[in-house]
Amino acid sequence: MVSMKALSATGWWNQLYKVGHVLYLLQWFPIALFNLRDAKTRPRIFPFFQALKENEAKNLPIGTAGFCWGAKYVTELCWDQTKTKDGKRVVECGFVAHPSGLKYPGDIEKIVLPYSCAAAEHDMQMSAEQAKQTKDVLTAKTAKTKDHGVEHEFVMYDGEHHGFAVRADEDEKVEAEQGKKAEAQAVDWFKRWFANLSPSV
């Protein structure tokens, strides 16, 4: 988180400071990219949700949350294209924070299930234009589907950086508060949609 904030800092002194953070990140990124590549994660994620819905959670609602790269898969689950063997949806709603790996606006336009997004103002993975596209698409979708019981939300956390919702600096009061607000956003979202469902989903 500290390195992510450092990379977005301005000023000539911070440019020098960035070099150390880039070198630090470079030692971990190749390993992370290898372990989190789509070919390795996709075969685990979607079958997991199918199996969960067909077994332990057969009569329970499932919500899913994704942060950074995990948001890509939550978004796809909210397209409602992944089904159980008997054709049931595998999740009821999704929450994402500081998403990465998405294609804008296409991936957002495909969303059909209730979807909540917590965005960071300073995020290399979601530019200001992409954030605006996301907000506009979700707002338009809600206007069309609200009467049918499907809504979406987009919350911009001003001043925050990528990763704030899971790796907030507790020593920085504002950042810590914003991280807790994003957590509350997720919890409230799931409570809201689970409350609207019957026990035998």
Residue ranges of model-derived segments:
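N-terminal cap/leader regions of alpha/beta-hydrolase-fold enzymes
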Residues: 1-201
